[in-house]
Amino acid sequence: MIQGTLYIVSAPSGAGKSSLIQALLKTQPLYDTQVSISHTTRAMRPGEAHGQHYFFVPVAEFEHMIAEDAFLEYARVFDNYYGTSREAIQQVLATGVDVFLDIDWQGAQQIRAKMPDARSIFVLPPSKEELDRRLRGRDQDSEEVIGRRMAQAVAEMTHFAEYDYLIVNDDFNTALLDLKTIIRAERLRLGRQKLHHDALISKLLAD
Protein backbone atom coordinates (compact mmCIF):
# COMPACT_ATOMS: atom_id res chain seq x y z
CA MET A 1 0.00 0.00 0.00
CA ILE A 2 1.33 3.42 -0.98
CA GLN A 3 1.48 5.78 2.00
CA GLY A 4 -0.59 8.94 1.83
CA THR A 5 0.96 12.39 2.31
CA LEU A 6 0.30 14.75 5.21
CA TYR A 7 -0.17 18.34 3.99
CA ILE A 8 0.19 21.17 6.49
CA VAL A 9 -1.61 24.32 5.33
CA SER A 10 -1.10 27.65 7.09
CA ALA A 11 -2.10 31.23 6.34
CA PRO A 12 -3.07 34.47 8.05
CA SER A 13 -6.75 34.91 8.84
CA GLY A 14 -8.50 36.19 5.72
CA ALA A 15 -6.14 34.60 3.19
CA GLY A 16 -8.74 31.99 2.21
CA LYS A 17 -6.94 28.87 3.44
CA SER A 18 -10.02 27.11 4.83
CA SER A 19 -12.09 27.92 1.74
CA LEU A 20 -9.37 26.47 -0.50
CA ILE A 21 -9.20 23.25 1.50
CA GLN A 22 -12.99 22.84 1.49
CA ALA A 23 -13.16 23.51 -2.26
CA LEU A 24 -10.41 20.95 -2.82
CA LEU A 25 -12.23 18.30 -0.79
CA LYS A 26 -15.38 18.83 -2.88
CA THR A 27 -13.43 17.95 -6.03
CA GLN A 28 -11.44 15.04 -4.57
CA PRO A 29 -12.98 11.66 -3.61
CA LEU A 30 -12.96 10.75 0.09
CA TYR A 31 -10.84 7.66 -0.61
CA ASP A 32 -8.22 10.03 -2.02
CA THR A 33 -8.06 13.10 0.25
CA GLN A 34 -9.39 13.95 3.72
CA VAL A 35 -9.10 16.75 6.23
CA SER A 36 -7.55 16.02 9.62
CA ILE A 37 -9.99 15.55 12.51
CA SER A 38 -8.72 16.95 15.81
CA HIS A 39 -9.27 15.77 19.37
CA THR A 40 -10.88 18.26 21.75
CA THR A 41 -12.17 18.44 25.30
CA ARG A 42 -14.87 21.01 24.56
CA ALA A 43 -18.53 20.03 24.66
CA MET A 44 -20.16 18.75 21.50
CA ARG A 45 -22.39 21.35 19.84
CA PRO A 46 -25.76 20.70 18.16
CA GLY A 47 -25.27 19.16 14.73
CA GLU A 48 -21.75 17.89 15.49
CA ALA A 49 -20.81 14.21 15.46
CA HIS A 50 -17.96 12.39 17.19
CA GLY A 51 -15.34 11.35 14.65
CA GLN A 52 -16.75 13.64 11.97
CA HIS A 53 -16.16 17.15 13.29
CA TYR A 54 -13.90 16.31 16.24
CA PHE A 55 -12.97 13.41 18.45
CA PHE A 56 -14.62 14.56 21.70
CA VAL A 57 -12.76 13.23 24.75
CA PRO A 58 -12.71 13.98 28.51
CA VAL A 59 -9.95 16.20 29.91
CA ALA A 60 -8.42 13.27 31.80
CA GLU A 61 -8.13 11.25 28.58
CA PHE A 62 -6.62 14.17 26.68
CA GLU A 63 -4.05 14.82 29.40
CA HIS A 64 -3.19 11.11 29.46
CA MET A 65 -2.58 11.31 25.70
CA ILE A 66 -0.29 14.31 26.29
CA ALA A 67 1.69 12.30 28.83
CA GLU A 68 1.95 9.44 26.32
CA ASP A 69 3.23 11.84 23.60
CA ALA A 70 0.23 10.85 21.49
CA PHE A 71 -0.19 14.25 19.81
CA LEU A 72 1.69 15.67 16.86
CA GLU A 73 0.68 19.06 18.27
CA TYR A 74 -1.76 20.38 20.82
CA ALA A 75 -2.78 23.64 22.42
CA ARG A 76 -5.07 24.89 25.16
CA VAL A 77 -7.52 27.53 23.96
CA PHE A 78 -9.27 29.20 26.89
CA ASP A 79 -10.51 26.21 28.94
CA ASN A 80 -10.40 23.57 26.21
CA TYR A 81 -7.68 21.41 24.69
CA TYR A 82 -7.30 20.84 20.95
CA GLY A 83 -4.80 18.43 19.44
CA THR A 84 -3.82 16.33 16.42
CA SER A 85 -3.45 12.64 17.22
CA ARG A 86 -0.38 10.97 15.74
CA GLU A 87 -2.15 7.59 15.61
CA ALA A 88 -5.29 8.96 13.94
CA ILE A 89 -3.23 10.66 11.22
CA GLN A 90 -0.99 7.63 10.64
CA GLN A 91 -3.98 5.28 10.38
CA VAL A 92 -5.45 7.35 7.54
CA LEU A 93 -2.10 7.81 5.78
CA ALA A 94 -1.51 4.05 5.93
CA THR A 95 -4.59 3.54 3.71
CA GLY A 96 -3.02 5.70 0.99
CA VAL A 97 -5.24 8.71 1.67
CA ASP A 98 -3.70 12.20 1.71
CA VAL A 99 -4.55 14.23 4.82
CA PHE A 100 -4.84 18.03 5.01
CA LEU A 101 -4.18 19.78 8.29
CA ASP A 102 -5.29 23.42 8.67
CA ILE A 103 -3.01 24.85 11.36
CA ASP A 104 -0.94 27.90 12.35
CA TRP A 105 2.83 28.20 12.00
CA GLN A 106 3.51 27.17 15.60
CA GLY A 107 1.58 23.93 15.21
CA ALA A 108 3.28 23.41 11.85
CA GLN A 109 6.69 23.59 13.50
CA GLN A 110 5.68 20.95 16.04
CA ILE A 111 4.37 18.62 13.35
CA ARG A 112 7.37 18.97 11.02
CA ALA A 113 9.65 18.04 13.94
CA LYS A 114 7.70 14.80 14.46
CA MET A 115 6.77 14.04 10.84
CA PRO A 116 9.54 15.42 8.61
CA ASP A 117 8.00 13.79 5.52
CA ALA A 118 4.97 16.10 5.74
CA ARG A 119 4.61 18.69 3.00
CA SER A 120 3.80 22.26 4.02
CA ILE A 121 1.93 24.97 2.12
CA PHE A 122 1.57 28.64 3.03
CA VAL A 123 -1.21 30.79 1.56
CA LEU A 124 -0.72 34.55 1.19
CA PRO A 125 -3.25 37.27 0.34
CA PRO A 126 -2.41 39.37 -2.76
CA SER A 127 -1.93 42.56 -0.71
CA LYS A 128 -2.45 44.09 2.72
CA GLU A 129 -5.29 46.16 1.29
CA GLU A 130 -7.11 43.04 0.08
CA LEU A 131 -6.50 41.29 3.39
CA ASP A 132 -7.97 44.29 5.24
CA ARG A 133 -10.99 44.24 2.90
CA ARG A 134 -11.57 40.54 3.56
CA LEU A 135 -11.32 40.99 7.32
CA ARG A 136 -13.78 43.88 7.21
CA GLY A 137 -16.09 41.96 4.89
CA ARG A 138 -17.09 39.70 7.73
CA ASP A 139 -18.94 42.65 9.34
CA GLN A 140 -18.55 41.19 12.80
CA ASP A 141 -15.48 42.87 14.31
CA SER A 142 -14.71 46.32 15.71
CA GLU A 143 -11.84 48.49 14.45
CA GLU A 144 -9.80 47.43 17.45
CA VAL A 145 -10.35 43.74 16.72
CA ILE A 146 -9.60 44.21 13.01
CA GLY A 147 -6.38 46.03 13.87
CA ARG A 148 -5.36 43.22 16.20
CA ARG A 149 -6.21 40.58 13.60
CA MET A 150 -4.16 42.45 10.99
CA ALA A 151 -1.16 42.60 13.33
CA GLN A 152 -1.51 38.86 13.98
CA ALA A 153 -1.73 38.23 10.24
CA VAL A 154 1.50 40.13 9.58
CA ALA A 155 3.23 38.16 12.34
CA GLU A 156 1.96 34.89 10.83
CA MET A 157 3.16 35.88 7.34
CA THR A 158 6.75 36.35 8.53
CA HIS A 159 6.99 32.54 8.73
CA PHE A 160 6.13 31.84 5.07
CA ALA A 161 9.73 30.87 4.21
CA GLU A 162 9.54 27.87 6.57
CA TYR A 163 7.17 26.13 4.14
CA ASP A 164 7.72 23.96 1.06
CA TYR A 165 5.16 25.69 -1.17
CA LEU A 166 3.73 29.19 -1.44
CA ILE A 167 0.33 30.07 -2.93
CA VAL A 168 -0.91 33.64 -3.43
CA ASN A 169 -4.71 33.66 -3.25
CA ASP A 170 -5.57 36.54 -5.56
CA ASP A 171 -7.91 34.70 -7.92
CA PHE A 172 -9.56 31.83 -6.00
CA ASN A 173 -9.80 29.42 -8.95
CA THR A 174 -6.13 29.95 -9.79
CA ALA A 175 -5.13 29.37 -6.17
CA LEU A 176 -7.23 26.19 -6.09
CA LEU A 177 -5.53 24.98 -9.27
CA ASP A 178 -2.16 25.71 -7.66
CA LEU A 179 -3.16 23.59 -4.67
CA LYS A 180 -4.25 20.71 -6.92
CA THR A 181 -0.99 21.01 -8.87
CA ILE A 182 1.04 20.62 -5.68
CA ILE A 183 -0.82 17.40 -4.85
CA ARG A 184 -0.34 16.09 -8.39
CA ALA A 185 3.38 16.88 -8.33
CA GLU A 186 3.83 15.14 -4.97
CA ARG A 187 2.10 12.03 -6.30
CA LEU A 188 4.54 11.96 -9.22
CA ARG A 189 7.62 11.87 -6.97
CA LEU A 190 9.98 9.03 -7.85
CA GLY A 191 9.59 7.09 -4.60
CA ARG A 192 5.80 7.04 -4.85
CA GLN A 193 5.76 6.26 -8.58
CA LYS A 194 8.21 3.37 -8.12
CA LEU A 195 5.82 1.73 -5.67
CA HIS A 196 2.76 2.46 -7.79
CA HIS A 197 4.31 1.06 -10.98
CA ASP A 198 6.47 -1.66 -9.43
CA ALA A 199 5.09 -4.46 -11.63
CA LEU A 200 5.44 -2.39 -14.80
CA ILE A 201 9.02 -1.37 -13.99
CA SER A 202 9.97 -4.98 -13.25
CA LYS A 203 8.61 -6.11 -16.62
CA LEU A 204 10.28 -3.26 -18.51
CA LEU A 205 13.68 -4.00 -16.96
CA ALA A 206 13.45 -7.79 -17.17
CA ASP A 207 15.92 -9.57 -19.47
From Swiss-Prot:
Q: Which residues bind ATP?
A: A11, P12, S13, G14, A15, G16, K17, S18
Q: Per UniProt, which keywords does this protein have?
A: ATP-binding, Cytoplasm, Kinase, Nucleotide-binding, Transferase
Q: Which SUPFAM superfamilies match?
A: P-loop containing nucleoside triphosphate hydrolases (SSF52540)
Question: For this protein, what is the EC number?
Answer: 2.7.4.8
Keyword ATP-binding recorded: yes
Superkingdom, natural source: Bacteria
Q: In which broad location class does this protein mainly occur, judging by the first location in its UniProt entry?
A: cytoplasm
Any single GO CC term annotated in Swiss-Prot or TrEMBL for this entry: cytosol
One Pfam family linked to the record: Guanylate_kin
Q: Which GO terms describe its molecular function?
A: ATP binding; guanylate kinase activity
User: What is the similarity comment for this entry?
Assistant: Belongs to the guanylate kinase family.
Q: What is this protein called?
A: Guanylate kinase
Provide the species name: Sodalis glossinidius (strain morsitans)
Q: What is the lineage of its organism?
A: Bacteria, Pseudomonadati, Pseudomonadota, Gammaproteobacteria, Enterobacterales
Q: Quick one: which gene encodes this?
A: gmk
